A protein has these predicted regions:
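Sequence/structural signature of beta-propeller domains
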Residues: 2, 6-8, 20-343
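Gram-negative bacterial Sec-dependent N-terminal signal peptides
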Residues: 9-17
């Protein structure tokens, strides 16, 4: 009799759990996301880009304005892989490759960046309100902005998602957009690495999203790139030179494309450079190339530079770069600013 009672109780418990656990899971999924976390970011100024020539300002076609070494005790700070500067040159939005937003405001003394204020971080949210990380949508490597809409490229799952940032801010939910079928052929750690939005009204390709693969290449070894949306969607290629890989891109106000590149060798070290691709060259099926604006190595103040953005200030075009420290104590999170020298 006791055995039968225990058995009946066990069956009853299983029945209750069968109903209660899914209901609890649904309630958990329905819970609102936590609010953004205010964080403190310490900023150490970088007075010279090349410590061997501390008074030098011109590097290639760029003039060094200043930089910062950024640190924070917040556990999710680091791994910054993309950046968008607001038109005011102070407010910014960035993303880490772990799927976290970072926004804040750069302070200046004259034209030199001196600190970061009003910094906040929050996890990116998927379509159902769960975090991207919980969906295993890893490596949020690229970002581009079109007004109130922010596009983010997710490397490991070969996706591009859009956020209604203007409406919901850091609590916006990702909405996948249609991407070219070729994305599925990219290596899992070499998919979409760079996104740039061609400004509306800047020419025939205005309103197009440009996506560039890190290690997706054609049979000649050139970088695969894509015009998505806009008036003339389709693939094109960027000439690969000197073994550099693409790490980010951004569009100038006239539509010209700035491509941030890097290469690393255990015996040669780390190098970065920026190329300018005229927008007039870009079209479906085209092979494009352009001049190098700057090339730097570890003799200068660089690290694993993964984000680039542009804004206008005082009649100058200002480039802001940020590095991904891979959450390593051996690397740094650098924010660097340059102005584009007149041609």
């Amino acid at each position: 009799m006791a055995t039968r009672s225990i058995g009946c109780a066990a069956i009853a418990l299983i029945a209750v759990l069968a109903v209660a656990l899914p209901a609890a899971a649904q309630r958990k999924e329905a819970e609102p996301p936590p609010p953004p976390s205010a964080i403190e970011i310490q900023a150490q100024p970088i007075p010279a880009f090349d410590h061997r020539e501390p008074d030098r300002r011109r590097f290639g076609m760029l003039d060094f304005r200043g930089g910062l070494v950024l640190t924070s005790t917040f556990s999710e700070f680091g791994g910054i892989s993309s950046l968008n500067m607001a038109a005011d040159g102070a407010n910014f939005l960035a993303a880490s490759d772990r799927g976290w937003w970072l926004r804040g405001r750069i302070t200046y003394t004259g034209t030199r960046p001196t600190g970061i204020t009003a910094a906040e971080m929050a996890p990116m949210l998927g379509p159902d309100g769960r975090t991207l990380a919980s969906r295993r949508w890893y490596d949020t490597e690229a970002m581009a902005r079109d007004g109130n809409t922010v596009y983010v490229g997710i490397e490991r799952v070969h996706r591009i998602v859009r956020f209604d940032y203007g409406k919901d801010g850091l609590l916006a939910k990702a909405r996948p957009i249609e991407v070219p079928a070729a994305f599925r052929s990219f290596p899992s750690n070499g998919s979409v690495e760079a996104l740039a939005f061609v400004p509306r009204g800047s020419g025939p390709l205005g309103g197009s999203l440009i996506a560039i693969a890190e290690r997706g290449r054609d049979r000649d070894g050139n970088h695969l790139a894509f015009l998505i949306g806009g008036p003339r969607p389709g693939p094109f290629t960027i000439k690969r030179r000197n073994d550099y890989d693409v790490s980010d891109a951004t569009a100038l106000p006239n539509g010209d494309l700035l491509v941030l590149e890097r290469k690393f060798g255990w015996t040669t070290g780390l190098f970065i450079r920026i190329r300018k691709i005229p927008i007039a060259q870009i079209a479906p099926g085209a092979l494009v190339d352009g001049p190098v604006l700057i090339e730097a190595d570890l003799g200068q103040q660089i690290d694993n530079m993964e984000g680039i953005s542009v804004h206008r200030s005082g009649g100058e075009t200002v480039l802001t770069l940020i590095s991904d420290n891979n959450f390593s104590v051996l690397q740094r999170t650098l924010l660097l600013q340059f102005s584009l020298a007149p041609e």
